[in-house]
Amino acid sequence: MTNVTENITCPVKRIECIPPEKIYSKGTIFPLEVGMKRVKLSKTYFCNGQEFSSLPLYDTGGPYSDPSVSIDPEKGLPPIRKSWGFQRDEKAASSITQMHFARKGIITPEMEYVSIRENQQLEEWISSFSRGGAKVSPITPEFVRQEIAEGRAIIPANINHPELEPMIIGRKFRVKINANIGNSALGSSIEEEVEKAVWSCRWGADTVMDLSTGANIHQTREWILRNSPVPIGTVPMYQALEKAGGKAEALTWELYRDTLIEQAEQGVDYFTIHAGILLEHLPFAEKRLTGIVSRGGSIMAKWCKYHKEENFLYTRFEEICKILQRYDIAVSLGDALRPGSIIDANDEAQFGELKVLGELTKVAWKYEVQVMIEGPGHVPLHMIRENMDKELAYCHEAPFYTLGPLITDIAAGYDHINSAIGGALIASFGCSMLCYVTPKEHLGLPDRNDVREGVIAHKVAAHGADLAKGNPVSWLQDELMSRARYSFAWEDQFNLSLDPEKIRAVHAQSMAARGHTEKNPHFCTMCGPDFCSMKKSKEAAEQE
């Protein structure tokens, strides 16, 4: 693993710049240290009467963004949650889930942790912020507890994943993004997948799903978990199918159950489980143009038709919940019947399954298991709102987690843009987490650069939705960017962007190619020194 050690632990290469500082905010209830990045600005900016010479940024990079931490991938990350002194098994006789404690009125370390993360040390700014007349308050541990107790938010954090830095998924919080990685029978290695997982976190992924279907599924997952500061999700059906020799008809409940327990023991934080696809839905799916495009859904459909029996994930769902409850694993109820083409969007198969997911949500909550609902898929723009409205109504306001939606079927090679457009819209309506799509979607297995493109595109979508929802911290970052842009403070512009390394390199190369070597020019190569609108606007304002 020598190469992967270098590739995942090396600092990001920067061009003549001061890297963001890693800072830690301490808890007041528990002995927590919540990591963030702090960007030092080249000047002091005044926003709404407050001075900002630096800005704390939400950081998903964990120890990888702290140059003072030495990381050995073979040993894994520090198990930070082991030192928090909250012994769940001593406090609960039957359940140790976040929802259990939330319903009991107990704040856990994870609840305080995510409240600190969401505020980013900007409580004063948040309290003074107002857009459209609505006042906003900082996130408190008590508010987090209430949202989890009501099922409107989840903290996916398996007790066996102590390396994890807790995060929260819910529509009252920052919109999150997930990055899918994983090998296939046709390519990739453990080293490559670990590298993609780590760099997903460094580029801004809030969770990572390991969707490996090829060789060494168990070992790949173990390496990823021990080196991941973000929640890891899986689709257990993939490994169960491997154990069944790749034959859907050979699957059994016992095989699947044992796979669940195996992955739970390793520390997987949330499982996608396709328990909502039923025999009654299959005739509707067979009428579609593109049928069933979910891998897990197609596996279960084949099993049901072969055995002429109901989906065992549905009939055994209470037993599944009892397993998840023991480890505090969240369930992501999979949309086995998501549309794979816009012609199939919002059909009877899709919404029929969604109603079943709502029923299963209530079952999971009975066992105090945290739930989120997976959504489409391929949906044209004008049909996206209906998906959000129906999810809230059918699924009792459980967090929605969507794959896009992709708004057209003809964007192959650019499906990360396709997905980000639909994702921005549905997130502005209340979707809690967006599953990224890379440029390789529909074409092949993504490499590290594809992962980067997918993550950043969906960070743009999530941030845009946060602005639409009036998130004060997001608005501050945009205002500071605009002030830096109008001041020609290039280094501040780089550091306040979602991908500082890329835009810094693009700017430097563009200027150098045209013979400009100025450190802080009052123009860029788009307009040049004589046609810069902001430069002329400033000059006009300064004229008497």
UniProtKB/Swiss-Prot annotation:
[4Fe-4S] cluster binds at C524, C527, C532. GO terms for molecular function: 4 iron, 4 sulfur cluster binding; carbon-carbon lyase activity; zinc ion binding. GO terms for cellular component: cytosol. One of its GO terms (biological process) is thiamine diphosphate biosynthetic process. Keywords: 4Fe-4S, Iron, Iron-sulfur, Lyase, Metal-binding, S-adenosyl-L-methionine, Thiamine biosynthesis, Zinc. Binds 1 [4Fe-4S] cluster per subunit. The cluster is coordinated with 3 cysteines and an exchangeable S-adenosyl-L-methionine. It is an enzyme of class 4 (lyase). Its EC number is 4.1.99.17. This is Phosphomethylpyrimidine synthase. It comes from Pelodictyon phaeoclathratiforme (strain DSM 5477 / BU-1).
